[in-house]
Amino acid sequence: QFWLRRARRLFPALYAVLLAVAVWAALAGTAEQQSQLRRDMVWSIFYVNNWGQILGDVPYFAGEAPLLRHLWSLAVEEQWYLLWPLVFVALLRIRAPRHVVGGAIIAGAFVVFAYMFWMHSRTPTPLGGPPAAFEGVDRTNFLYLSTITRAGGLLLGAGAAFLWRPWRWTHAPDAPVGRVLDPVGAAAVAMLGCAASVAVLTEGYVYQWLLPLVSILSLVAVMVAVHPAAVGFRRIMSWTPLVEMGKRSYGLYLWSWPIFVIVDATTGSVSNFVWAMILTVAVSEASYRYLETPV
């Protein structure tokens, strides 16, 4: 049932984007875009776009931007949706205490973070393997795009789900702890905004400590948001415009990048950027109302 619900939620909008991009590329795309699309389409259909970019040595931070470049993150997400339920069921059968299971999962997250640090500090670029499939792979591409290195943040959240259950500890919205949690949540969001604004994704510090820090800050924000006593932070996160944007965030993400590439809004043109934003919002709203919600 979980997999079926995920398919109903994710597949229709994704395949609509793939169809629209394919039609545009066939009619108006450059020869390079058409060539890239023939390669990327299959990877994207089966939610392995991230591995297609890694193994195909498609430079994520250089060269002409592929129309489907952004689908790497959805590939990581879907691979997690496929594998994690199986791991979760296996963990339940162990019958270990929740705090032991959660602690072990969080420890696994920090193993991944340590692996990222080691890989960036000690391994050559391009990579030399093993496995043989990674021979010649760009190190930065692998660190940024691979499911292996991105598993750290996912494991962090999964482990916390075993441990953090504040609604069982208190139901009092005026609990004194709220006076501590509200500024903690706000600080986490502010720091995430700063990280997104100043990070240069090709720099080593991103993989040595910034991505792990972003994962931890994101987890802190979520942990505060689900605590009954964090009334102020919960009220901000429940602000209607934010909620409505969140409902449409999947479509906004899917449509924004190809529209920005097609409108040529990635080159610094203000007018093109404005047109791309208007088109993205309009198409995403149509996708949400007439495709995502009905299904």
What are these regions (language model features)?
Residues 1-295:
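Membrane-interface helix/loop caps of multi-pass membrane proteins
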